[in-house]
Amino acid sequence: MLLIPAIDLKDGQCVRLKQGDMDQATVFSEDPAAMARHWVEQGARRLHLVDLNGAFVGKPRNEEAIKAIIAEVGDEIPVQLGGGIRDLNTIERWLDDGLSYVIIGTAAVKNPGFLKDACSAFGGHIIVGLDARDGKVATDGWSKLTGHEVADLARKYEDYGVEAIIYTDIGRDGMLQGINIDATVKLAQSMSIPVIASGGLSNLADIDNLCAVEGEGVEGVICGRAIYSGDLNFAAAQALADKLRDGQ
């Protein structure tokens, strides 16, 4: 089980939002590159970056912080980025700068042709982020709820050739209420590409529950508020996941 620390970037700072609300941001660090180094030292094997400003305006906004993170740890572990990625030039630029994966969210829903082109041009580097409330996909920084079912879109994107799906339960994100295991497993069982869980991770019991369904196609989990608030010790969580994987 891949535990992936999230570094959410707003105005060049590392923050956490509550349920995607830009007005409810808690600043955890003014040095995102140092935060990236911290998580690598704690045993992280991949990092998940979100350009929050970029997600809302539809173009990259925290370039300086993102490039600093890539320079700090990008040659040691894969780094993935979502937020404000709406065209092929942006993808190419970020991959050239050293990102391993780009995450397409809103643009995948609104412009499937773009996603298809991205998978053709940059196969192996494209992840789709699907954010949902009650099984329905949301877009535009969670501000708009669509009529699309998560599973329907995910299967379509699998056909396009995406590398993985990050599934976020909006209702649980930043609330420390536990991962929506049932919905995540149901999605993973409906496709052959990996699903990465997101939204609500709160304690070691969640890690236990996730590891129990790893064989169903749930490859990893995004670790957000819990590892910043102290509710979850990241190093201990990764150690537990490794122990469970090895059957000890």
Swiss-Prot record:
Pfam families: His_biosynth. It is found in: Cytoplasm. Pathway: Amino-acid biosynthesis; L-histidine biosynthesis; L-histidine from 5-phospho-alpha-D-ribose 1-diphosphate: step 4/9. Disulfide bonds: none annotated. GO terms for cellular component: cytoplasm. InterPro entries: Aldolase_TIM (IPR013785), His_biosynth (IPR006062), HisA_bact_arch (IPR006063), Isoase_HisA-like (IPR044524), Isoase_HisA-like_bact (IPR023016), RibuloseP-bd_barrel (IPR011060). It comes from the Bacteria. GO terms for molecular function: 1-(5-phosphoribosyl)-5-[(5-phosphoribosylamino)methylideneamino]imidazole-4-carboxamide isomerase activity. It is an enzyme of class 5 (isomerase). The keyword Transferase does not apply. The keyword tRNA processing does not apply. It catalyses: 1-(5-phospho-beta-D-ribosyl)-5-[(5-phospho-beta-D-ribosylamino)methylideneamino]imidazole-4-carboxamide = 5-[(5-phospho-1-deoxy-D-ribulos-1-ylimino)methylamino]-1-(5-phospho-beta-D-ribosyl)imidazole-4-carboxamide. Its main location: cytoplasm. Its EC number is 5.3.1.16. Keywords: Amino-acid biosynthesis, Cytoplasm, Histidine biosynthesis, Isomerase. One of its GO terms (biological process) is L-tryptophan biosynthetic process. The active site is at D8 (proton acceptor), D131 (proton donor). Belongs to the HisA/HisF family. PANTHER family: 1-(5-PHOSPHORIBOSYL)-5-[(5-PHOSPHORIBOSYLAMINO)METHYLIDENEAMINO] IMIDAZOLE-4-CARBOXAMIDE ISOMERASE (PTHR43090:SF2). This is 1-(5-phosphoribosyl)-5-[(5-phosphoribosylamino)methylideneamino] imidazole-4-carboxamide isomerase. The lineage of its organism: Bacteria, Pseudomonadati, Pseudomonadota, Betaproteobacteria, Burkholderiales. The gene is hisA.
